[in-house]
Swiss-Prot record:
Coiled coil: none annotated. InterPro entries: Antp_homeobox_Deformed_sf, HD, HD_metazoa, Homeobox_CS, Homeodomain-like_sf. Sequence-specific transcription factor which is part of a developmental regulatory system that provides cells with specific positional identities on the anterior-posterior axis. This is Homeobox protein Hox-C4. Disulfide bonds: none annotated. The gene is Hoxc4. It comes from Rattus norvegicus (Rat).
Length: 76
């Protein structure tokens, strides 16, 4: 059971070394295109050793952050 839980819910140590590089690559891709095709999402997921779902959710969250930053009026 412990092995199953560890594989389903990995701790923060998993992939920490690549985390900054992964975010950098995702940000570069987002700068180029805010929406991904499924084919591109698969390519990115494979190259960054992440799941398609992780890529999809990262882009959804990043679009919401972008929208929040660009839609809000500048405070005076």
């Amino acid at each position: 059971l412990v092995v199953m839980l560890e594989s389903r819910f990995p701790g923060p140590a998993r992939g920490v070394a690549n985390c900054r590089q992964q975010v950098l690559e995702l940000e570069k891709e987002f700068h180029y295109n805010r929406y991904l095709t499924r084919r591109r999402r698969i390519e990115i997921a494979h190259s960054l050793c992440l799941s398609e779902r992780q890529i999809k959710i990262w882009f959804q969250n990043r679009r919401m952050k972008w929208k929040k930053d660009h839609d809000s009026p500048t405070p005076k």
